[in-house]
Amino acid sequence: MKKSKITFLIAELFLVVIAGFFIHQIFREDVPQKRVAVILSNSGDKRWDGLINGLKQSANVNDVHLIICNTDDIESAQDEKELIDEQLENDVDAFIICPAPGEDTSDMLGQLGDVPFVLITQDAYSEDGASGFVTIKPDNYKIGYTLGEQIRANDADGLRGKSIGIITGYSQTEGSVSGKAGLMDAIEGTGCEVSWVYSRCGNPNICDIVDILGKVDYMVVMDTY
C-alpha cells in the first residue's frame, strides 16, 4: 500500500501549503498583528503535526498570532460552537476550522457572519452537497476510489467472492461520506460483499470493535483511531 501512503502525504502537504496561503492573503494588509484560532478535533493527535507546524511557520512569516485550541474529540456542532464562542470572547480575528460532524454544523458556521474562517480537511456535512464555505481539502471521493482500485488490482480474483469491512470517521461528515462513496464506486461490479461498515462513535477501542464485527478478507480504514 505504498502508493496510498504517498497519496495521503501529498494531501497533507497540500493542506499545509494552502492553509498557509490563506493566512497570507487574509492579513496581507499593513495592520497590527492579527489573531487566528485553529480548531481541530483532538488537537494533540499526531495526524495534525504536519499541518500545525506548517501553519506556525506561515504565521511567523506573516506576523500572525496563531492560537491552537486545546481540544478533545469534537463530536457535535455544539461542541465546536463553544470553542468558537470562547475564542470570539478573546477577540480573535479569524478561524481555521475542521468542521464538526452533523447536519447542524453548516448552520452554526453560517452564524459567524462577517468573521473570516476557512474549513480544512473536509467540507461541512450537508445532504444537499457543498456548503459554499471556503474549504481547503483533499478530494475525499478520489481517495476512497483510489483505495478501492488498489485493493481490486492487488487481489488475484479481482475481489470476486471476497468480503470487505469498512471503518470510517463520524458518519455525518463530508470526508466519511465522500470517501465511502468513492470506495463503493471503485469496487462496484466486482462481486465482492461489503460485510459491515463501522462509523466512529465516541472514542472506542477499535480492536474490540473489529473482533465483534467479524472476519473479512479486506478491511479498509478511512480514519485514524
Question: Where do the PLM segments sit?
Answer:
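Hydrophobic alpha-helical segments within soluble ligand-binding/sensing domains
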Residues: 134-161
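Extracytoplasmic/secreted envelope proteins and their assembly/folding machinery
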Residues: 52, 56, 80-84, 88, ...
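Flexible loop/hinge segments that line or gate small-molecule binding clefts
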Residues: 104-142
